[in-house]
A protein has these predicted regions:
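A short linear-motif detector with a strong N-terminal bias
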Residues: 131-133, 243-248, 294
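Extended catalytic-interface subdomain
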Residues: 151-154, 158-234, 266-267
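Low-complexity, glycine/alanine/valine/leucine- and proline-rich hydrophobic stretches
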Residues: 281-309
Length: 454
């Protein structure tokens, strides 16, 4: 019998439905292509909570772009039966209204009910992204249910915030399909800018929280800042709705504790996807530098995802990029699909013995761009408890003499290869080589890496 799982998705990854059970979010293309319907949709979304209630996690968009369905497929191969709304004999999915706060009482009650539904069996919490903040709010509200939790498996947890939320609120993302723009940047910013959970995702108050390496936001004076404390960046016409949301987020979540407690957790952190590395708050604006792949998983900075700590917290870094058997990068939304995660799922869900985690992936863009001067290889090597492997050295066998990459007490390393001089050896346009990992007491040999070459 599979271990029971309670799944808490991220933001904005839950459906919103009306009183008839019809899905309002995500909207259909027709809802956004017709101007009158678009205005009605946006107005309805801004009326919070209005007549909308949370539905299940979004399985897919238009039946094409998999969301939670990609996770459900993986769990299905491991014996889990999951219905259309995300329930099953050993599985409960808790959709939540992401327009409200991460600690909204109805959401927390739904999480608690999901745990109780499996009693006396202990549950595994599978949490993704903003779901980490929902989970912490649940623990604070229901400490009596901590004994009902067997393990926490987190993917890309936004434990200490993310700049992606700040970008979405301030500048906004546009949405299009087949080249037809459905939402403009301003419409996207207006939609997300009215949601409390977006402000809950801003990095917290540096004066009240031990940010560690999370010094992502600075004010005009150059000092660490929180967008929920320094409100100078908010555009004047947005202040009427943005200030109350920022004030609420700061009051509730401005002070955060890095200590997770004694619960056992496997905390999966990705790096290798374009992620905002910093933000500068100036008058009525936010300055973002270029996205950087070495800062996170494409949405959440690794410094935030790895910020949480505790005596039983095992933090595992996985490189995001092109693997030999899986060249499509598994960014933030689909981290569980990474080949590097297969071992983790077996350990947590199937009680497989823990073994050291080693992995290497080529940068997904450089791996296929024949004109790029370099190919970046991201490597990770960690012991069974997530700590660095002792005296670990990776030997990249790319020529007559292997290239050593010493980890020097770290869990992550980067190898950059100049593309010139490499010629295809695995197919008509692919160069393949292997990496041997050696450490005190063990080794992992012939880890394959590949990229395009002439």
């Amino acid at each position: 019998m599979p271990k029971p799982i309670v799944f808490v998705p991220g933001f904005p990854a839950s459906e919103l439905r009306d009183a008839n059970g019809d899905t309002v979010f995500p909207p259909s293309p027709a809802d956004l292509l017709v101007s009158t319907r678009k205005r009605a949709f946006l107005a309805r979304m801004r009326k919070i909570p209005g007549d909308l209630v949370p539905g299940p996690p979004i399985r897919s968009v238009l039946g094409i772009a998999k969301q939670a369905q990609s996770l459900y497929d993986l769990l299905g191969h491991r014996g889990y039966q999951i219905t259309g709304d995300g329930d099953g004999p050993d599985f409960r999915a808790v959709g939540w209204d992401w327009r409200l706060g991460v600690d909204e009482p109805h959401t927390i009650a739904a999480v608690a009910d999901a745990v109780r539904s499996f009693a006396p069996r202990k549950v595994i919490f599978l949490i993704h992204s903003t779901g980490a903040l929902v989970f912490r709010a649940f623990l604070a509200a229901h400490p009596e249910l901590e004994a009902s939790i067997d393990h926490v498996l987190a993917f890309g947890g936004a434990w200490c915030g993310t700049l992606e939320a700040l970008f979405a609120v301030h500048r906004g993302h546009s949405e299009s399909i087949l080249g037809i723009k459905l939402l403009t940047e301003d419409e996207g910013a207006d939609l997300i800018g009215h949601t409390q959970a977006a402000y809950d995702l801003f990095p917290p108050d540096a004066a009240r929280t031990d940010l560690g390496e999370m010094q992502l936001v600075h004010g005009a004076d150059g000092k660490p800042a929180s967008p929920n404390v320094d409100l100078s960046w908010i555009k004047p016409d947005r202040l009427v709705y943005a200030k109350p949301l920022a004030d609420s987020a700061n009051e509730r979540l401005g002070k955060r504790d890095r200590e997770f407690g004694s619960l056992p957790m496997t905390n999966v952190v990705g790096w290798g996807g374009p992620t905002w590395p910093a933000a500068l708050l100036v008058k009525n604006d936010v300055v973002f530098p270029a996205e950087d792949k070495d800062f996170g998983d494409g949405t959440v900075p690794w410094a935030s995802a790895s910020w949480i700590q505790g005596p039983n917290v095992r933090t595992l870094f996985i490189p995001i990029g092109a693997f030999v058997a899986d060249p499509i990068p598994d960014l933030h939304a689909h981290m569980w699909e990474s080949l590097a995660v297969t071992q983790i799922l077996k350990e947590v869900l199937e009680n497989a013995p823990r073994t050291p985690l080693v992995a290497a992936a080529a940068d997904s863009d450089e791996a296929i761009d024949i004109d790029s001067e370099f190919v970046t290889i991201r490597l990770t090597a960690q012991s069974t408890d997530g700590k660095p492997l002792p005296d670990c050295v990776a030997l990249a066998k790319v020529g007559g003499t292997p290239i050593p990459v010493p980890f020097n007490g770290s869990t992550r390393k980067i190898l950059r290869l100049r593309r010139a001089g490499f010629h295809h050896n695995a197919s008509n346009d692919v160069f393949r080589f292997t990496i041997d990992f050696h450490w005190t007491g063990g080794s992992h040999l012939n880890f394959g890496v590949s990229f395009r070459a002439v």
